[in-house]
Amino acid sequence: MKNILLAVDDTKGSKEAVSSFARACKCINPDRLILLHVEKLEGRSLIDGMLGDPEMATLKETLEGTDYKEALDRRAKRILDYYSKAMSENDVQGVETMVRVGHPADEIMQAAAEEGVDMIIIGSRGKRTSHLFMGSVSREVADRSEIPVLLVKSSGST
């Protein structure tokens, strides 16, 4: 595994995925680790069926420069700085950060393809019934991916 994409946000599952990766990193020893944070447009799931890709692209462009987008960017920077520091403290080399905007599973899959990664690592909340109603980003990534996906379940999840 030379190129790994580690999808991160500010959830417990993400923190545990990063912690697990940091412990295993000496064995894996990747050349490149991409920390990816996806800025999710709130309400995206409600408008999924109503907007196609061109309309979503227009919405993303419209948000550029707004207070809302700036708040999303500050949050993304804080999250990526936190995980970059954790990787540095564990002597992980080759760390890159990336921010994308949109539906998390779509953006993770697209980034993985564009960057030619060998594996995706993502935290999982581990809730047994939540995916029945709202779907699960980690489950969707695992189902759609043609490369290995490591799901790290949060301890203490039900």
Stretch-by-stretch model annotation:
Residues 2-63, 90:
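Small/aliphatic-rich secondary-structure junction motif
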Residues 37, 123-125, 153-154:
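Short secondary-structure boundary segments
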Residues 58-78:
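A short acidic, glycine-rich active-site loop
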Residues 74-120, 156-158:
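Structural beta-alpha unit
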